Every structure is written in structure tokens, then in C-alpha cells.
Amino acid sequence: MKTFFLAILIGVSMAMTAQAQSTKEIMYVGTYSVRGSEGIYVFEFDRKAGTMQPIQSISNGKSPSFLALHPSGAYLYSVNEGADKSGGVSAYAVDKATGKLTFLNGQSSLGGGPCHISVDKTGKTVFVSNYGGGSLTVLPVKADGALGEATDSVQDSGTGPNTQRQEKPHVHSATLAPDNRFVYVADLTTDKLNIFAIDANASKVKPASTPFASVKPGSGPRHFTFHPNGKYAYLVEELTSTVATFSRDSKTGALTLLQDNVKTLPDNFTGNNTSADIHIDSDGKFLYQSNRGANTLAIFAIGNDGKLTKVGDQPTEGKTPRNFLIDPKGDFIFVAHQDSDNITIFKRDQKTGKLTYTGQSVPVPAAVCVIMANR
């Protein structure tokens, strides 16, 4: 009988422990290798308390500035932006129980300054954007999650009217379509989104039937995101601190420009600024874009026609906001600041889209990218 009751007590204890753990989620932060940064930081987020606690740091001195998780959640990939002429990428195994990382392998990105990495929805192919090299590189994912050598690479060409920033190609991001049939590659210099059809099994790409979409010269395409309904898409225009809106043909992948150079800065801001990152809440009601200089998140309401109407600006409580994260449940926004070495946490009103600073500022040297694991 005592054994029976002991077994019950152990079972209840384990259930309570599991329940407590379920309120905590794993987050990963990519950084530049300056000011004492160790590389990639792993945090545990307590949703009830609204706090982040560090649980691991992974040594990587080559500026693992941007991160992406495998669809299975079992692997994580980072760029190694570094100062090397030819950049690199790294693969890590994820301990599903703890969220901690173990290094698997690295590969060349076949281009300098890799700044963005993404994984297709089958988990078979990784796309790397080489900012310095002006190219897109495609790598296969092996059965154990490690990266194979590059199987494809596309070199862009051209210049733009901004002679300081658009002097040569600068590929800035590669974003997968919701149906996983196309990848959209932003080049800051050519003011184009280049569109490629994907062969995920072979880890190859080829130009789509409509091979690109253009925005106003000098705008500087950076990051790109899709509306949850897949009908609309939105582009950060870094150099003009604006955003562009597109409709999308699901069959051909072609984009049609609906709005261009929509202002994102506060009306009273007159200083220097470049826009950085862009995300939409899971309900498809609100869009947010980060501004470096103004140090704000611009907040837009999304209409039924996909068009944007600005509803506010939120100071980010830090300097140089780069990547940011809307948590999957839509309750919080986390903002990574490159120059104030912190991540700030905001509570989000899902009805109005407005943000409230929680007072939580988490120290991370040269924070650039923040993502959350699917658990």
C-alpha cells in the first residue's frame, strides 16, 4: 500500500513539474562578436512572470548574428557574419528537453558577410543571404541535421542611386513563401525582390516565371514577410525608412505592388534612420517595423485589402533595434538592440496592437536576432 501511495505522489510531483515547465519557453539570441559577446545565447522565458533567464551561451567568435530553427525544432542554424572574405554557417543540435545547443558542423556560405538564414518547410534546404558578397547560397540539410556543402549559388549584379549604400549588390534576406514553392530574395542595392522557384529535394533554385518585383529606386529592400492568409506580403525599405505592400499570385509567385514608400517614422523625427525588421501578428491584424535611429517600432493596422494604416509608434527602450519577435501567442514582443546591448520586453494588446513596456531589459552584448523555439 505504501508503495502504491508513493507511486501516486511521484506521479503527481512529475505532473506538477511538467506543468511548471510548460509555462517556460526557450529563446535564442544571435549577436555580433564585440563587447564581450560569447556568440549565441539561450534563454528560458517565463510567460507568467514575463522574464528571461539565461541558461546557456555557445562560444562563436564569428558574429552569429542571425538564426533560424529547423521545422522539427531539433536543429538551429546560424550565419557566421564575421570579417572573413568568405562567410560561413553553423549547425547545432537542440536538446528538446532543455533547449540547449550542441555544435554539429559548419560550412562556407560562398560569399562574404552572410546576414540572414532561413530553412524551407520540409527541413531539407537552407538559404543564406550574403550581404557582402551579393549572393544567395543554397545548402542541403543532412539526415542528422548537419549542413552539407552548398548545392547552388546565385550571384546578383547591379548598382543603385544611393552611391554609398548601393555601390554593389547586397543580398539581405531570403523568405520562403507560405506554400514553400518560392523563395523571395531582397537585394538592398537593386531595389528588387528576386523570385526563385524551389526544388527542396535537390536544394536548387531557378528564376520564377515572373523573376522579380521592383520598388522605388533608392528604397533599399531588406526584410520581407507574408500575411498569414498568403495573399499579401510586406517589404522593409531600409534606406528610405518605409514599407511596401504587395499582393501575391499563389500560382506563379508573382508580386503586384499595392503601396510603396509608406512612411514608418514618427512625424516629429528629423534625425538619421534606417529601418531593419518586420513582422505581422498571427491574426494578421497588425504589422510592426523596427527603426534604427528613431529607436521605435512603427505599428500599422492591416486592412481587408492588405493595405497599411499607421496607428502608432512605440519607443523600444534601447539603441539600434534590429530583429524583434512577436511571441507565437501574440502576448509579447521582444526587441534586440545592437548598440545598447539589451533585449526589451513589451506586453501587446491584441485588440489595438499597441505595446506597453514591461520594464524588463535583458543584458545581451550586441544583440541582433531573437527567436523562440516551438515546444
Ranges and model annotations:
Residues 36, 61-72, 110-122, 157-180, ...:
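Beta-rich, blade/repeat-based domains predominating
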Residues 33-36, 81-85, 132-135, 190-192, ...:
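Short glycine/acidic-enriched loop and turn motifs that connect beta-strands
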